[in-house]
């Protein structure tokens, strides 16, 4: 199996190269999952860690633990996402592709409490 991905999307976690497409390919097969995207989030110890964003198919719910178990069964431990985020929809650019830069920007903004 050979995964082809954009070099700028590659995540370097503790010296290991992680290609988001590899994680996305596995996560897309999880029950109830419609769309997936993986981006890197800065980590003070490891450099970057992968974060998986998923959306649910209409009428379905995404079981985050089931997605995590599927990923753990299929991927090396260092490739597992540090976090799985379920969104109503993924941001898209004007041509309809998933806007990964928007997801990276969202991760860079500190969460606020209500």
Regions found by a protein language model. Give the residues of each.
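AMP-binding/adenylate-forming catalytic core of the ANL superfamily
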Residues: 1-79, 88-91, 96, 102-105
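A short, polar/charged loop-to-alpha-helix boundary motif
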Residues: 106-114
């Amino acid at each position: 199996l050979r995964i082809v991905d954009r070099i700028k999307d590659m995540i370097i976690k503790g010296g290991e190269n992680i290609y988001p497409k590899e994680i996305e390919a596995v996560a897309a097969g999880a029950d109830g999952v419609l769309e997936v995207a993986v981006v890197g989030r800065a980590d003070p110890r490891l450099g970057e860690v992968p974060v998986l964003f998923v959306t649910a198919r209409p009428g379905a719910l995404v079981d985050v633990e089931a997605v995590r178990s599927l990923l753990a069964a299929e991927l090396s431990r260092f490739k597992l996402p540090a976090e799985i985020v379920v969104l109503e929809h993924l941001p898209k650019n004007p041509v309809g592709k998933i806007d990964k830069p928007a997801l990276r920007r969202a991760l860079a903004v500190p969460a606020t409490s209500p």
